[in-house]
Amino acid sequence: VTADKIKTLSDIQYIPYTTKADLRDTYPFGMFSVPTKQLVRLHASSGTTGNPTVVGYTREDLDNWAEQVARVATAAGATQESMVQICFGYGMFTGALGLHYGLEKIGATVVPTSAGNTQKQLKFMRDFGTDTIVATPSYCLYLAESAKEEGHPIENYRLKLGLLGSEG
């Protein structure tokens, strides 16, 4: 497919795409478009329903990813003044590091607390003045409930922005 073949929205059907099944069927590196020696990072899904879905990133991929996250975070309201607590796991899950580097790119202060340890999350939010949170929507709800139970209602925190996702 060449660019001259794509003229209308309906022409998108001619663009080949990669499915999760494609990635699983060629586990681990069969669908990569560059040799593994050009990769600087690998991430993978948990593989609970089959082979893990492996994604490899080149330096250029990571730079582009950070730039895209920086743009999205800025559009959402994050700034270099933001104190951002990232509550996504920093393991093989691809989300935490992408957000981390994108937020650093705009000059925000990143607090990489990772997932879990709710009481420590809340303590850091209070003590550090966290104004932006990166988490799943359900974990944000759990944090609010836990804060109330601890006698520190979430309304008393400085939170004003949530970059939420990773739930289907």
Name each region found by the language model.
Residues 1-44, 50-67, 71-75, 79-81:
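Nucleotide 5′-phosphate-binding alpha/beta core
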Residues 28-29, 56, 86-87, 107-109, ...:
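Short, contiguous strand/loop micro-motifs
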Residues 39, 62, 89-92, 138:
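Short glycine-enriched loops at secondary-structure junctions
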Residues 45-48, 84, 133, 162:
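Conserved S/T- and glycine-rich ATP-binding loop of Class I adenylate-forming
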Residues 74-110:
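Conserved AMP-binding loop of ANL adenylate-forming enzymes
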